């Protein structure tokens, strides 16, 4: 797992942090109830931040595809798939934790209901599902559907349900 952490480039990490820090500027602080409301109603988070992260994860899978023969030879096919999947889930959960923490610190936790917390859990599970679709690209030929489908799911769920 530790060698895979080297694949997280400082440049990618800095770009994501800058995009997260821009949330208050883009969404404006006025008339916003709490951080979950911001998460679901902000087009910036869905259109820019989430898609940027999905594209970055897709690029990581493409790097894994280039290294797949070496990794499979050293670790075995099953161990390689498990390690890469765990890596992607951990990075996704880390991203969501940073995003949720920042939104909580900036916008607070007022007017919270069980319905909003349930929506937050559903949003997180949806995001993990999108990452799983990207993960399916591992050890296969490059196909644009593996990135287009998560982006379409992200947009449809944002505009139809949230």
Which sequence ranges carry the predicted segments?
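Alpha-helical transmembrane segments
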Residues: 11-17, 45-48
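Alpha-helical membrane-embedding segments
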Residues: 68-78, 103-111, 143-149
